[in-house]
Regions:
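Hydrophobic alpha-helical transmembrane segments of membrane proteins
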Residues: 1-67, 77-210
């Protein structure tokens, strides 16, 4: 059953990457195409990452129990913690980002209307998003058993989306500006990279000293 869901997640990610990369709306495939799929995705990324954090919290297996049980063995403490942390790297919640972004970027470049992208900048943008995804991976470990905090986050995110739908608030403008800057100014990849390095060692020290 687990392999079915993994296969389904990969297939859906690939399909959505192709669909969104061509500017087609999944809700209205026969309707008018999205004129600028790249800008559209940058606007929605703040919500996508937020909702994925909630889904990850609900379904991703956290290696805390593995760490605690292994700490009772003669194995070196640092190796145990790194082993458990590195297990999460291969989570399907991380890989679906690859399976979505790769076809999305390919379709962007193939489309004559939207294909005027700097390939190296687009690659850096992809890597930046992947780094952010892995940041949420390790953040999820810290959020273990903090149900109230995650519920509050989910409620706030939903309320913001409702306000945006009713034209009372629009944070997608800021989302587009932030994520587009990762394409426009490639050196900014240092921000998600340094954030990932920081949270990796923060999580490591959290378990090592506690």
């Amino acid at each position: 059953m687990m392999f079915f869901w993994i296969f389904w997640s990969i297939l859906m990610s690939l399909s959505l990457g192709v669909i969104h990369g061509t500017g087609t709306s999944l809700l209205n495939p026969e309707g008018e195409k999205i004129s600028d799929p790249f800008s559209w995705l940058n606007k929605e990324l703040i919500y996508i990452i937020g909702y994925m954090m909630i889904v990850r919290y609900l379904f991703q297996k956290i290696p805390i129990l593995n760490i605690r049980s292994l700490l009772l063995t003669p194995l070196k403490k640092s190796k145990i913690i790194r082993y458990a942390m590195h297990q999460t790297i291969f989570s399907i919640f991380n890989w679906i980002a690859f399976f979505y972004l790769i076809p999305f970027s390919i379709m962007l470049n193939l489309d004559p209307d939207t294909g005027d992208f700097n390939s190296s900048n687009l690659l850096i943008w992809n890597l930046s998003i992947i780094l952010i995804v892995y940041f949420t991976n390790f953040l999820n470990i810290l959020l273990n058993k903090k149900d109230n905090l995650v519920v509050i986050f989910g409620v706030v995110l939903t309320l913001i989306k409702i306000l945006e739908y009713n034209n009372l608030l629009d944070i997608s403008v800021y989302s587009e500006s932030i994520f587009y800057s990762l394409y426009e100014t490639p050196i900014l990849i240092i921000v998600p990279l340094s954030s990932l390095i920081f949270i990796y060692y923060y999580v490591f020290n959290f378990f090592f000293f506690n």
